[in-house]
């Protein structure tokens, strides 16, 4: 019995250690209008942490689809932050989603009361 459990554990470890299948060549982001393909992953991470949302907040099942209005709003917000950050001469990102949203879907319009 002990050997059977050990064998099953080894098989489970070997199974989970396998690489995930790689996406086919050309399977990168589609329908990009504001971001470059190399910026997408970082920008999505910034949005999810800055607004406290998940991918499905803006994206339909077909990630390239524009069917959800929130995706169009997100595009405008990404463009706005790019324009603001372009005004800083050091080239660094000074403004992010979190700057206004503070981890919530709707930005606070006033400081919280103490």
Task: Locate the predicted segments by residue.
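Primarily the internal scaffold of c-type cytochrome electron-transfer domains
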Residues: 27, 104-114
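Short, flexible, mixed-charge glycine/proline-rich loop motifs
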Residues: 39-51, 86-92
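An alpha-helix initiation/capping motif
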Residues: 71-75, 95-98
């Amino acid at each position: 019995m002990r050997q059977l459990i050990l064998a099953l554990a080894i098989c489970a470890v070997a199974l989970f250690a396998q690489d995930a299948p790689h996406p086919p060549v050309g399977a990168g982001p589609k329908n990009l209008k504001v971001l470059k393909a190399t910026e997408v992953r970082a920008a999505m991470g910034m949005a999810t942490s800055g607004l406290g949302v998940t991918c499905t907040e803006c994206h339909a099942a077909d990630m390239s689809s524009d069917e959800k209005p929130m995706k169009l709003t997100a595009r405008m917000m990404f463009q706005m932050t790019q324009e603001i950050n372009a005004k800083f001469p050091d080239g660094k990102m000074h403004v992010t989603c979190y700057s206004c949203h503070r981890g919530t879907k709707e930005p606070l319009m006033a400081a919280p009361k103490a």
